[in-house]
Amino acid sequence: IRDRSKACTAKLNGVYKYGEIIKEKGFVFMDSPGYDPASVTGQIASGCNIIAFTTGRGSAFGSKPSPCIKIASNSKMFAKMYEDMDINAGVILSENKSIKEVGENIYNLLLNIASGDKTKSEIQGLGDFEFVPWQIGAVM
């Protein structure tokens, strides 16, 4: 994993099964499918109460049980999907912003959302049908 990582060097504090209650603080891993609604449903079942969701292709995923901020990984997609994306992390490349600065923006947005501000998907009323428990077999 370290060979393929792009930035993070945080210690992995725990590995969890899908929907298992998270008992550790910090960076943990949960086995889940790649399908956005099923993956986030497992995180919510594990106790997650706010989601920081990165996307490079423009997933417009939203969640009602837990607010979901969407972090665009590139500025071109952010510009096309401005109404759906909460943060443009693509500015690290397109505007030469520092990872620290963008990270602070994400952190501050998380604090604001946790304090009652609405995510873009909440403002649009999205997320009613995004609660999808993982079933054994293919998930589509």
Can you say where each PLM-predicted feature lies in the sequence?
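A structural signal for small-residue-enriched, beta-sheet-centric alpha/beta enzyme cores
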Residues: 81-88
